[in-house]
From Swiss-Prot:
Protein known as: Prothrombin
Post-translational modification: The gamma-carboxyglutamyl residues, which bind calcium ions, result from the carboxylation of glutamyl residues by a microsomal enzyme, the vitamin K-dependent carboxylase. The modified residues are necessary for the calcium-dependent interaction with a negatively charged phospholipid surface, which is essential for the conversion of prothrombin to thrombin. In the penultimate step of the coagulation cascade, prothrombin is converted to thrombin by the prothrombinase complex composed of factor Xa (F10), cofactor Va (F5), and phospholipids. This activation requires factor Xa-catalyzed sequential cleavage at 2 sites, Arg-315 and Arg-364, along 2 possible pathways. In the first pathway, the first cleavage occurs at Arg-315, leading to the formation of the inactive intermediate prethrombin-2. This pathway preferentially occurs on platelets and in the absence of cofactor Va.
Signal peptide start-end: 1-24
Family named by the database record: Belongs to the peptidase S1 family.
Amino acid sequence: MAHVGGLWLHGCLALAVLVSLVHSQHVFMAPQQALSLLQRARRANSGFFEEMRKGNLERECVEEQCSREEAYEALESPSETDAFWAKYTACESVRKSREKLVECLEGNCAEGLGMNYRGNISVTRSGIECQLWRSRYPHKPEVNSTMYPGADLRENFCRNPDGSITGPWCYTTSPTVRREACSIPVCGQGRVTAELIPRSGGSTVNVSPPLETCVPERGRQYQGRLAVTSHGSPCLAWGSSQAKALSKDQDFNPAVPLVENFCRNPDGDQEGAWCYVAGQPGDFEYCDLDYCEEPVDEEVGDALGENADAAIEGRTTADDFQPFFNEKTFGAGEADCGLRPLFEKSSLEDKTEKELFESYIEGRIVEGSDAEIGLAPWQVMIFRKSPQELLCGASLISDRWVLTAAHCLLYPPWDKNFTENDLLVRIGKHSRTRYERNIEKISMLEKIYIHPRYNWRENLDRDIALLKLRKPITFSDYIHPVCLPDKETATKLLRAGYKGRVTGWGNLKETWTTSASEVQPSVLQVVNLPIVERLVCKASTRIRITDNMFCAGYKPDEGKRGDACEGDSGGPFVMKSPFNNRWYQMGIVSWGEGCDRDGKYGFYTHVFRLKKWMQKVIDRFGG
């Protein structure tokens, strides 16, 4: 056994070296060198028959040729028979040689088209990490384990379920590359199925940014001479008549000198330095500086110190609520936001909000439950006109504006690029499909505003969009806006272990079934989820996490479950402030790798981080 374990360790180390080399932008191996790393030492005993030996399988199917029925009689399991038969038929060309057949069945090398391959290589020929077969991000798979039950579509290992002529392949974690072949050693030959190739420009997926000198405090003290935006637009001089007109009534810090046309951050925008530019669409753009990462949740200690929990538990007076937006452009609703007509305004609690408060003083909806009517009066359904279908969730923030995720509207890997004329919003709904007469309101859209630095190509950074309604909506017991957090609220509540709430009409479980009734809820679902430590979030994925994101969900050892799932995207992650009894939207459902998978979490757009961008757009286009 020691000999076998040593060979196994040798194989793992060889694979680790290969992955390291493939991810380099400058080092690519010759085929013979790659093959020497990819080929795995033979074990003392046949691993395939150590795992699969049942009945007379070896005698029936290796020493002789067998039928599927004979294989089933030996294995006595439909799933194991499917898996064995897929490999056995893929190895048909080498059945006459026992040694070659066993090598082919073990699956550590490719025979023919490589449909027999069952190894654990999980990078493509150009060095991109493979997407999990069960995941829908960043690509929606057309090939899955239901279609090919014997293809062993586990984890993110390279496979060839559909008989691709290029050999084993996978969907990639790069949104710009849907699927790509892998470089797999061919059985008994000194070559691989696909030669290793460099990617032009290198892959940015899974690679952390280099350690360089960064700009602190999101550029609030930046005094550099950069005068061009990230889109290449020249900045207007701060003293120009156009810039002065746009700056009128803005809350600028007088300590920030607005010199010439250099990028500055006079309003403390969490997005960083910016400047005015000529003409449409927004008259302002952000500048491309390398900012130091400063997550809001790590600032909590400075704000509350060790007395944070005591401050919440011992609260005696309600915090004064200060409106943030200009009502002329934002519309009505902010002064009364987050106070639900059927609960807070009626002095009632919903069934699970106590769980949220207890998490404060203690430190896709899957596994959720039916929401009470009026529980989330800010919940919005984004509805596609043709074909008619639920597209995403969203939230009402005033009588004129709706907040959602940018990827609901623009995501080329899923062929999404919707305009105002493609969509409408349904507000006040409880039922997923039924039209709720005299309760729900349907509104057309006037304009869609997507964050200019939304990064769909890599990691959905700044996954946020604003929808302006064509006409103001009328509030009711079932339609009411949610609050958006200020810094004080964000620092008090966005703490690891504190629970927030996600609502939506998304799938109840992750599945490939074709029957919608099995996975789609009939009414709005709700689940309470704890915020997760930032380091744990980063360690749970190979995708680069930014400070415009946070993650939430239960850890494998916590004994509880829950997550957002397909269809919940764009919906709100809300928390109730124990200081003023208002509900605040802290996040937007953005992305996740599968639904409710152990060790994986849901990722949310950090609303407070992007609030200044929202203010600029609303001030400019809300009139």
